[in-house]
Curated annotation (Swiss-Prot):
Residues 1-37, 51-80, 201-221 are annotated as: Disordered. GO terms for cellular component: cell cortex; centrosome; microtubule; nucleus; spindle pole. The gene is Fam110c. It comes from Rattus norvegicus. Residues 209-221 have a biased composition (Polar residues). It is found in: Cytoplasm, Cytoskeleton; Cytoplasm, Cytoskeleton, Microtubule organizing center, Centrosome; Cytoplasm, Cytoskeleton, Spindle pole; Nucleus. GO terms for biological process: positive regulation of cell migration; positive regulation of phosphatidylinositol 3-kinase/protein kinase B signal transduction; regulation of cell projection assembly. It holds the Pfam family FAM110_C. This is Protein FAM110C. The modification Phosphoserine is found at S255. May play a role in microtubule organization. May play a role in cell spreading and cell migration of epithelial cells; the function may involve the AKT1 signaling pathway. Keywords: Cytoplasm, Cytoskeleton, Microtubule, Nucleus, Phosphoprotein.
Length: 326
């Protein structure tokens, strides 16, 4: 606590009431005492490092102006400017000079230097890089790139020669069919001379002669197989002996309705329904009456094939009776 002044000191410092001039001089010579808040605000710059974000802003505004001789280390700015926002910069790592990706790109750059000029400029700019990332290319890298280019060129030539040698004659386009044309008779003087060197067309024609023979053989074989298949389906897959015993004329497809005529069938099956007309044969009217008109073609053919199969079995086993088709 602050001690109060005594009465004697007050009497000495207080001027007399009659001398007003002395009182005015005393007031001018001795300034008024500052309060604790004002003294703290005046000495604030000595103890506070920064005034940003302080809670005593209004106190600094009401501060008493100081003497011109007083200097502060950290003067208070009149206008508080916002601090710039610091952004984190992400630095990209430069590619390693011995990276496999760079090696492949360098090889492509060496190969295609004459093909694409714009790409060449871009690749040069990429490999040169900035001033900080410039790195001298070692002679070993250059030597490896040259060796790789030489090996790749040799491999390309080797593959091309192998493909040309291994290309079969069948890959050539088929020759146009040769049409025999009768050439007019020319006199002996106008007859063209036979060239010494044979042209490529003649060579191809001579090479394709064997192929033409094979095509003729295939066509003959195909026609034979087709005839055999037609015979098989015409006689319902029966053996030639069965067909001969039943009669080939009974398998003719003259009309849509299959009406086989059984005239030459002679079997020891007297109890069957066909034995009644074994002398005169099966009449067409009776067969048409047996086969209804509403029966489909597939069902009718299936019944006939089943009946023929039964006939074959009856021939193999004479004891079995021959039944009429359903």
């Amino acid at each position: 606590m602050r001690a109060l002044p005594t009465l004697d000191s007050l009497a000495r410092t207080r001027p007399s009431l009659g001398d007003s001039r002395a009182a005015e001089g005393t007031l001018t010579r001795q300034p008024a005492n500052k309060s604790a808040v004002e003294r703290l605000a005046a000495d604030r710059a000595k103890y506070v490092r920064s005034t940003l974000g302080s809670s005593r802003g209004p106190v600094s505004e009401n501060r008493v102006p100081e003497a011109p001789g007083v200097q502060h280390r950290n003067p208070i700015p009149s206008t508080l400017a916002p601090a710039p926002v610091a952004r984190r910069a992400v630095a990209r790592k430069p590619l390693r000079p011995d990276s496999l990706v760079i090696y492949r790109q360098k090889c492509e750059f060496v190969r295609g230097s004459d093909a694409d000029s714009s790409r060449v400029g871009l690749m040069k700019k990429f490999f040169q890089g900035s001033g900080k990332d410039k790195m001298s290319v070692t002679p070993e890298t250059t030597r490896v790139a040259d060796e790789y280019k030489t090996k790749e060129t040799e491999a390309t030539w080797t593959k091309a020669s192998q493909a040309a040698a291994a290309k079969p004659a069948s890959m050539l386009p088929p020759p146009a069919p040769v049409v025999a044309m009768e050439s007019p008779a020319l006199p002996f003087e106008v007859a063209p001379r036979v060239p010494v060197r044979r042209s490529g067309v003649e060579l191809r024609a001579s090479r394709s002669k064997g192929l033409q023979r094979s095509q003729s053989d295939l066509s003959s074989r195909y026609s034979t197989a087709r005839a055999e298949s037609d015979t098989f389906f015409q006689y319902c897959g029966l053996d030639p002996e069965v067909v001969e015993s039943l009669g080939r004329e009974n398998f003719s497809a003259a009309s849509d309705c299959v009406t086989p005529k059984m005239r030459s069938v002679s079997m020891a099956t007297s109890d069957s329904s066909f034995s009644r007309h074994s002398e005169d044969g099966l009449q067409e009217e009776e067969l048409l009456e047996q086969v209804p008109s509403t029966t489909s073609v597939v069902e009718r053919n299936a019944r006939i094939i089943k009946w023929l199969f039964t006939c074959k079995k009856a021939k193999e086993t004479p004891s079995q009776k021959l039944q009429e088709p359903a």
